[in-house]
């Protein structure tokens, strides 16, 4: 199994189509299996229909997403987890440090 690349939402457009990604985002909207996540001024649309039966989504909730980027820029979600209580500054620092090592 291929590992997911840990990124920020604003880096999704720079990733290859089909690439497996992992990122954190705040729920801006959710309707009919389509999720809009934001982080600062960046946003991404995610299709959660594959995991839909197992998903409970609340507006403004922070979510940890693993999915594949489609050609149209939407991310097909493979795994979704709540990130309630996450220390955002520490998380951002950890992602930046990890990216420097990759």
From Swiss-Prot:
The gene coding this protein: ten1
Localization (cell): Nucleus; Chromosome, Telomere
Entry keyword set: Chromosome, Nucleus, Telomere
A biological process term (GO) from this entry: telomere capping
Assembly: Interacts with stn1.
Highest rank taxon of the organism: Eukaryota
GO molecular function: single-stranded telomeric DNA binding
Any Pfam family hit: Ten1
GO cellular component: chromosome, telomeric repeat region; CST complex; telomere cap complex
Name recorded for this polypeptide: Protein ten1
Gene3D superfamilies hit by this protein: Nucleic acid-binding proteins
Physiological role: Required for telomere maintenance.
């Amino acid at each position: 199994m291929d590992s997911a690349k840990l990124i920020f939402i604003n880096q999704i457009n720079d990733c290859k189509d089909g690439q497996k990604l992992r990122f954190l985002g705040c729920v801006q909207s959710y309707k009919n299996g389509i999720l809009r996540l934001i982080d600062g001024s960046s946003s991404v649309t995610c299709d959660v229909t594959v995991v839909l039966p197992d998903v409970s989504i609340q507006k403004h909730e922070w979510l940890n997403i693993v999915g594949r980027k489609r050609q149209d820029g939407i991310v097909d979600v493979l795994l979704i987890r709540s990130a309630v209580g996450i220390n955002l500054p520490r998380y951002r620092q950890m992602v930046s440090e990890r990216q420097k090592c990759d």
